[in-house]
């Protein structure tokens, strides 16, 4: 019975991961493609682009949007293997797709099972790297280990497993834009540290001005 269930889950993964087998396009996952605008992708997942999370605004605009396929999939469709998809945008364009697979849907599957399922979509892995961690700036680091990697000159696809939650995930990203985003995030953090003292001064002044305005108003209106 367990063997049948495991085979069924693998079939679901393969079906979801195999829109085309010829001329594998690493820059897409299911119906989502790197380089898509925030506005266009929001329409695809039925969300308001204004609800995207603002991560950093300077020196580059970094935003994220979370999509839960299980919540939106009709009950009549085949089982959904993905728990969550995190979309990352650089200056309004999708540069990274971070997928978290549902624990129940992947229960009992080995790392080789997952590699085989993903390979049905992206071809033979270019590297099997069980001891390599994802970059420290990645959402899943440092507790994730890459199992297999598919890549070309512009795109990297990484199948990983989290140590803490023991779940599988997939990260699809543009190498060039991911590097630009990482640099922008580091620079933004640096600017925030530099501006923190002045921001605190401004905050305290704003609170003091607000309190003084309330005091003056109440002085005029107070009756004992």
Place the predicted regions along the sequence by residue.
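Mid-chain, structured segments of secreted extracytoplasmic proteins
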Residues: 63-110
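Bacterial N-terminal signal peptides that target proteins for export
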Residues: 1-9
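Non-cytosolic coordination micro-motifs
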Residues: 24-61, 101-224
């Amino acid at each position: 019975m367990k063997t049948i269930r495991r085979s069924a889950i693998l079939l679901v993964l393969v079906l979801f991961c195999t829109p085309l087998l010829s001329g594998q396009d690493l820059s897409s996952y299911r119906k989502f493609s790197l380089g898509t605008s925030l506005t266009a992708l929001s329409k695809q997942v039925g969300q308001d682009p204004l609800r995207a999370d603002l991560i950093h605004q300077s020196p580059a605009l970094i935003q994220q949007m979370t999509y839960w396929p299980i919540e939106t999939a009709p009950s009549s469709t085949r089982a959904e293997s993905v728990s969550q998809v995190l979309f990352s945008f650089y200056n309004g364009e999708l540069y990274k797709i971070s997928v978290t697979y549902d624990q129940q849907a992947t229960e009992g599957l080995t790392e080789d099972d997952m590699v085989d399922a993903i390979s049905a979509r992206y071809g033979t892995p270019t590297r099997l790297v069980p001891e390599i961690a994802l970059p420290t700036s990645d959402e899943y680091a440092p507790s994730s280990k890459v199992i297999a990697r598919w890549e070309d000159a512009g795109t990297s696809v990484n199948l990983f497993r989290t140590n803490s939650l023991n779940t599988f995930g997939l990260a699809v990203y543009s190498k060039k834009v991911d590097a630009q985003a990482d640099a922008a995030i580091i620079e933004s953090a640096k600017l925030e540290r530099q501006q923190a003292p002045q921001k605190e001064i401004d905050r305290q002044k704003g609170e003091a001005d607000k309190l003084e305005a309330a005091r003056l108003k109440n002085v005029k209106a107070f009756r004992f």
